[in-house]
Amino acid sequence: MAYFPNIGTIPYEGPESRNPLAFKFYNPDEKVGGKTMEEHLRFSVAYWHTFTGDGSDPFGVGNMIRPWNTYSGMDLAKARVEAAFELFEKLNVPFFCFHDVDIAPEGETLSETYKNLDEIVDMIEEYMKTSKTKLLWNTANLFSHPRFVHGAATSCNADVFAYAAAKVKKGLEIAKRLGAENYVFWGGREGYETLLNTDMKLELDNLARFLHMAVDYAKEIGFDGQFLIEPKPKEPTKHQYDFDVATALAFLQTYGLKDHFKFNIEANHATLAGHTFEHELRVARIHGMLGSVDANQGDTLLGWDTDEFPTDLYTTTLAMYEILQNGGLGRGGLNFDAKVRRGSFEPEDLFYAHIAGMDSFAIGLKVAHRLLEDRVFEQFIEERYKSYTEGIGREIVEGTADFKKLEEYALQLGDIRNTSGRLERLKTLLNQYLLEVSAPSGSRS
């Protein structure tokens, strides 16, 4: 059965095209700096928002029109697989991602849940044999079911800890079987509402124990994918332990886990933490911890995770600027952890949304590449910090200066003169590059 019968393979038609079902900027085979766009961007479709999301919110029931929703139970799960690979093929995306409960319904017992998962994984495995689309990452949902009300690895109930471990064990086995590039840990319930009833030390210790067990089991079964932590400060939990990259990095270092993990950074989670997307990418990058990206955007006027498709070209450009300086994402990718708006309820809206996101990151890639090629910001930064390449600044950097020497130097100083940060000039340059690249004539790559 065709679930999108009126939509064919999405072509690249260039920036002058007015076809809503065509890419204007994303040309998978176009080379940018020696690699194709497809190799740079490594796009991925999120199974949960795209195939299980129904548009419901706290004020209204689901309203999405989805042809596969005429089914229920395991028949619905199978229909979603069919619809998924049809969409993957028509968008020509190289990757997808899922939580365990996205692909198969939970049973009355853990054994029944395993049975359901095995049946759907069999089906996915068959589709993957003839599809270019591979598994970027999978994960276990450890936050939706009432059993996880107090957390999973940080639950006050050891039975819940054990159940969560069983789900992750199964998830790692699925990851190995389907050839996942990564495995993600997102602690939506790993945190607390109040310290009045919380043993924070025990919870953090247990979270570390849980992650060490996961590392050990991955080695035991021969799964060599990259482990990823996805930081988020809040929602659904008031205070989550993986608040942001800096917080999660400190946790990994404290518990001897840093060498086993990198970060999966989501734009909207950065917004909730009070950071820009590029800030979180930069912190991860300079510590060698940038692993993958959940590509979306938030609404700064709203205080929750809106998971909008990314269309802000400043953000996609500055994100790709960090990713290119990182040497790419390695085994990671750009996963669209994004959902169409409640008012965009027709099946074709799924295509319009992904086209918008893919085009936006294609522009960001080309602008970032040209900025780096022309060393626009690098030249300015080098000049700004020039005082640390000579004289007393060089001694500071090389570790040969101490407080006594610095005091002696400072006592001899006259007036200290600073130079302008030129922020407005730099923003003008960024605008100029964006306009040049996004215009039809801006095709240099």
From Swiss-Prot:
PROSITE patterns on file: XYLOSE_ISOMERASE
Chief place where the protein resides: cytoplasm
One GO process term, biological-process aspect: D-xylose metabolic process
Recorded superkingdom: Bacteria
Record-annotated disulphide pairs: none
A molecular function GO annotation: xylose isomerase activity
Cofactor binding notes: Binds 2 magnesium ions per subunit.
InterPro entries in the cross-refs: Xyl_isomerase-like_sf, Xyl_isomerase-like_TIM-brl, Xylose_isom_bac, Xylose_isomerase
Coiled-coil portions: none
Quaternary structure annotation from Swiss-Prot or TrEMBL: Homotetramer.
HAMAP family, per database record: Xylose_isom_A
Family designation: Belongs to the xylose isomerase family.
Name of this chain's protein: Xylose isomerase
Gene (name only): xylA
